[in-house]
Amino acid sequence: MKFHILAVGNKMPDWVRKGYTEYCQRMPKEAELLLVEIKPEKRVGSKNTRQLLQAESERIRTVLPPGCHIVVLDETGKQATTMKLAEMMDRWMGSGQDVAFIIGGADGLHQDIKQMAHEKLALSAMTLPHGLARVLLAEQLYRAFSINRNHPYHRA
């Protein structure tokens, strides 16, 4: 099974790339972590926020794996403990369906993307930088997998 992270933004600092790569490499093939960076819409001319989000929404749809379980990351989503995320991961893996996590850009996500999601998840009630959200999500997915496999990484 694959966990796809579809993230709007393609010019991340080196620390983001290194942090994400660290946890991506730790994930076993049975729970492969794949990142797809989506080019953000340029803020030019008379484009308003709605138009920017619509353009990004279309880009997201073109790379969204067919038949996957869609989880939108949004500060208004459901907050879950790490143990709850481990339960969710166990359920997702049991379904055999790939999971796509969608992280919006500077202006968030278009309402259409939010409405097509099967779940909305919040990493925090606070707004996070998009690069940090990638690293945090990758780490939490690795931690959840470790919990489900009784790996000593999670010692809480």
UniProtKB/Swiss-Prot annotation:
Q: Which UniProt keywords apply?
A: Cytoplasm, Methyltransferase, rRNA processing, S-adenosyl-L-methionine, Transferase
Recorded hits in InterPro entries, A to Z, give: Alpha/beta_knot_MTases, RlmH-like, tRNA_m1G_MTases_N
Q: Does the keyword Nucleotide-binding apply?
A: no
Q: Where is this protein primarily located? A: cytoplasm
Identify which top EC class this enzyme belongs to.
transferase
Protein's cellular compartments: Cytoplasm
**What family classification does the UniProt entry report for this protein?**
Belongs to the RNA methyltransferase RlmH family.
Self-association and partners: Homodimer.
What this protein is called in its record is: Ribosomal RNA large subunit methyltransferase H
Q: Which organism is it from?
A: Nitrosomonas europaea (strain ATCC 19718 / CIP 103999 / KCTC 2705 / NBRC 14298)
